[in-house]
Design a protein with these regions (language model features):
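A short tyrosine-centered beta-strand micro-motif
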Residues: 636-640, 673
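Bacterial N-terminal signal peptides
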Residues: 2-14
Length: 681
């Protein structure tokens, strides 16, 4: 590894040659225009123009011939998509070329060197943004960032007008409102619209600018499939045709790939990565096309693999996954890799959603049996684990907590040291336990969630400084189970964990708990803040599609003072859908608005099995015909009341016959509305 880093950081100083003549004034002008523009396609065009000149110095032409293909790769992303590479591994047209020696070196004395440094510097910084192995290793991260910033400093000195270079060197650039504030609209609606409009802008840009004909977005299938998680407030919350088209292209393109013929990937790697291809695509499409038999069958196929291939009974006669590494046809039970983990709900994510919707009895039997294994593991104190704490892994076939690592909290079942280190993806497991309790009616499945919540409350009441790794206090300092507790609160109305939720939950959840809109406004403002600066960090500068919102967290805030706001969309998603958490595990979205996501404010103020309430504000200039598709209401007859704060109320009878009942209505421009559905008294 040291040799690789030496190679990485030494390229710039191993290739000095005799100084190159800068060329004619016209050539110098083209280079300066290429360097100073903040538009990649313009830079490429100026360099192509330079390459067509007949009087270019021979050495400068050599450097240009080296540099121009690299600029082409970065600037003309989708043009480099290759239809022959349907697997996606070779078709990562945004980042597949970023290797240890990219771009190939040119002379430091070349007039093109500052442009070379611009690409080399950004590629070095993008690597830790993407790689957890680098990001979580301070020494390695500092070397990548340090050399990247040094090179970008050279580029900035030569081309001070280039905003992309300056963005990486701690400058911020405003991203103005896409629409002016509406003085008639409530504060929550203006804030929500600001973020929804920009999120819709981002989604549209990605689909229209980067999506290839086969659905890929340039990061490779394994990363492209994750991008819908960012899009969820628009994709799940609204009937937005552009977002739906883009996500459908991703999902159908992925399942058309050869490696998905078995219903799950044929690539052997760990569950965090193998589970994404089918988990993200199938789950998203089950939100968009809940009655489509194709996607239902794909969810059932995953359950079959869970039942017949991936799991068995361990030495303690408990049902568990046999390994962290498996495909659609085989399981690698090498002892080092043989762990069930809190990440494993990802592998069966679509099947869990199918179970939630259908209450399939065989799924109930097997999923609840699997969760019993985790309840038992949480209750024990094996290997020094605190009682009541869910481990991050259970070893196969012994059933002991942890893996082959010397500590229970670090199974060491994967090359990236932090991926399965406790708490790992704990929220996936706690949400699955909550779902199991709901589906079976058995509160014992929530016992690990309760004991962990109490540990968290105890810690917050009297925080321990530097708690010993593996101790209860150490676990409590790291655990993040607020989403599960919030979904439990929405499901049951139980206020037991309200004090903890008021500290850990997002602003929308706090608003629904207390009725205090200051929590809502704070949460929506937090969502909007990050989208007020540095537009390019969400679009043009993203090289790995699973890191679309990671620039501030994974790079900029290592240097920014004050820290830049993080793009946190949980309050936005909650306000639009009524869910107290995300759409991945045990989604409880109450509504999908049957309209596009622009020029609208939609706030769910109440939801449950017997009621639904919301506020709406239409920012447009003409009437808006729209509807609401309602998901949580029990079957029966309801009174639907639409109240216009100017024109009064209208009431009609609505019969709910299925989990997805629609109601249609019309909104007039610049008016506040409330919606209420209740069972007649």
């Amino acid at each position: 590894m040291n040799a690789i880093l030496t190679l990485l950081l030494g390229i710039a100083c191993t290739c000095a040659r005799t100084p190159v003549h800068a060329g004619t004034s016209h050539q110098t002008e083209l280079i300066n225009r290429a360097g100073n523009t903040s538009l990649e396609v313009d830079r490429y065009a100026r360099l192509v123009e330079l390459s067509k000149l007949s009087d270019v110095d021979p050495q400068l032409r050599i450097d240009l011939n080296i540099l121009l293909p690299a600029v082409d790769q970065w600037a003309n992303e989708r043009r480099n998509w290759n239809p022959a590479n349907s697997s996606g591994r070779k078709n990562r047209f945004l980042c597949g070329y970023i290797q240890d020696e990219w771009p190939p070196p040119i002379s430091e004395t070349s007039p093109l060197y500052p442009i070379w440094a611009m690409y080399r510097g950004r590629s070095l910084i993008q690597r830790p943004i993407q790689s957890g192995g680098i990001q979580h290793n301070p020494e390695r991260r500092a070397k990548y960032f340090g050399e990247g910033r040094r090179l970008l400093g050279i580029a900035r000195e030569a081309f001070p007008q280039n905003k992309l270079v300056r963005l990486y060197l701690d400058e911020t650039f405003p991203w103005p409102l896409l629409n002016p504030l509406d003085p008639l609209a409530p504060d929550w609606a203006n804030l929500q619209r600001e973020t929804l409009e920009k999120l819709s802008h981002i989604i549209t840009w990605w689909i229209e600018t980067r999506q290839a004909p086969d659905g890929q977005l340039g990061g490779g299938w394994g990363d492209d499939v994750e991008i819908w998680r960012t899009w969820a407030p628009v994709l799940v919350g609204f009937d937005d045709p552009i977002a739906i088209r883009g996500q459908t292209n991703v999902a159908e393109g992925l399942f058309a790939a050869e490696h998905m013929k078995g219903g799950y990937t044929s690539y052997m790697t760990d569950v965090e990565h193998t589970g994404e291809d089918s988990g993200d695509t199938c789950t998203s499409m089950m939100h968009l096309r809940p009655d489509d038999p194709v996607w239902q069958a794909r969810a059932q196929r995953i359950f079959e693999l869970f039942r017949d291939l991936w799991t068995n009974r361990n030495a303690r006669n408990q049902l568990q996954f046999k390994s962290t590494y498996f495909t659609s046809s085989e399981v690698d039970t090498t002892s080092q890799l043989a762990c069930d983990t809190v990440y494993h709900p990802r592998a069966v994510q679509p099947a869990l959603l199918y179970w939630q919707r259908t209450a399939d009895p065989e799924m109930t039997a097997l999923f609840s049996d699997w969760m019993r294994t985790w309840i038992a593991a949480a209750a024990g104190t094996e290997r020094g684990k605190p009682a009541g704490i869910i481990p991050s892994a259970i070893h196969w076939p012994s059933g002991t907590v942890g893996g082959l690592g010397k500590n229970w909290w670090d199974p060491q079942n994967h090359g990236e040291s932090t991926l399965y280190l406790w708490p790992s993806a704990m929220g996936m497991m706690t949400n699955t336990l909550l779902l199991t309790s709901h589906m079976t009616g058995d509160p014992s499945y929530l016992e690990p969630v309760r004991t962990m919540a109490h540990a968290r409350e105890k810690y917050l009441a009297d925080p321990t400084e530097d708690p010993a790794p593996g101790s209860e206090a150490w676990c409590a300092s790291k655990m993040r189970i607020a989403e599960t507790l919030a979904k439990y609160r929405l499901l049951t109305g139980d206020t037991t964990f309200d004090p903890l939720l008021l500290q850990d939950a997002n602003g929308y959840v706090r608003y629904r708990m207390t009725g205090d809109r200051k929590h809502l406004i704070k949460g929506l403002d937090r969502s909007a803040l990050a989208f007020r600066i540095n537009r390019a960090s969400y679009m043009e500068e993203v090289r790995w599609t699973d890191r679309q919102l990671s620039f501030n967290r994974n790079y900029a805030n290592h240097y920014a003072n004050p820290k830049l706001p993080l793009p946190t969309l949980s309050a936005l998603h909650g306000a639009v859908t009524g869910d107290f958490g995300d759409a991945l595990y045990f989604p409880m979205n109450a509504v999908r608005w049957k309209t596009h996501a622009r020029d609208i404010g939609a706030l769910v103020t109440g939801s449950g099995r017997r009621n639904f309430e919301a506020e709406l504000y239409h920012f447009g200039n003409t009437e808006r015909n729209m509807g609401a598709e309602l998901y949580l209401l029990d079957k029966g007859t309801y009174e639907f009341t639409l109240t216009d704060t100017v024109g009064g109320s209208s009431t009609q009878t609505l019969t709910v016959t299925s989990p997805r009942t629609q109601v249609r209505f019309t909104l007039s421009p610049q008016r506040r509305y409330t919606i209420e559905l209740r069972r007649p008294s």
